[in-house]
From Swiss-Prot:
Protein name: 1-(5-phosphoribosyl)-5-[(5-phosphoribosylamino)methylideneamino] imidazole-4-carboxamide isomerase
Pfam families, per database record: His_biosynth
Organism lineage: Archaea, Methanobacteriati, Methanobacteriota, Stenosarchaea group, Methanomicrobia
GO MF term list: 1-(5-phosphoribosyl)-5-[(5-phosphoribosylamino)methylideneamino]imidazole-4-carboxamide isomerase activity
Localization annotation: Cytoplasm
Family, as annotated: Belongs to the HisA/HisF family.
Active site (record annotation): 10, 135
Gene Ontology cellular-component terms listed: cytoplasm
EC number: 5.3.1.16
Amino acid sequence: MAFEVIPAVDMRGGKCVQLVQGVPGSEIVSLNDPLAVALDWIGKGAKTLHLVDLDGAIEGERKNAPIIEKIVQACREKGVSIQVGGGIRSFEDAASLLELGVSRIILGTAALQNPELVKQLSDAFGSSCVNVALDAKNGKISIKGWTEECAQTPVEMGREFEELGAGSLLFTNIDTEGLMQGVNPGPTRELVESVSIPVIASGGVSSLEDLKVLKQTGASGVVVGSALYTGRFTLEAAIETIRND
């Protein structure tokens, strides 16, 4: 499987934003038209987009659903995969997105609070449609928009969700997220080596070199947000770097 660079389109209050370490009000980027942003990434070569409804993740209300629907439609028309997370709390929430044409739904808090949901969705739609987000802070899992910490480690949870039917994992290192100070590949590598399903990395990418470092962990791809939006590097350069690595 080729390592993939996946642009993030994070939405809050109808805008495309980038937060520092997930903290509301810490926007370093705020753009008015998420659909235009998504189309721009597709035009620059993205094969997959990563959509997050931050209002859904933080407040449990999926306020950005109408915009997400438009972006999903655009992706389908252009043959681009799309993974969506944030505020997916129930089987019905997930099913409505998958029926809309979303390639993969990302379960965070809901999976950790109700692991059986992963099995139900995997049985109904196939494991490839189900991704579980493991967000780690100080080596422990964090939930509810990074506001609560759990006792379990990413490796423990990753193995459990693989058994329940998750087809992939999204691993975010909150310690480096949004800071653009570089990645810490150790925790990602540890998780990759502990499970047999693909692991997508996220958090802290600030340079093209970081992409190479994460590729070497065995991760299947990386979600990139702040570095692209603030011009640290272009998506075209990122795709080229990975192709030549």
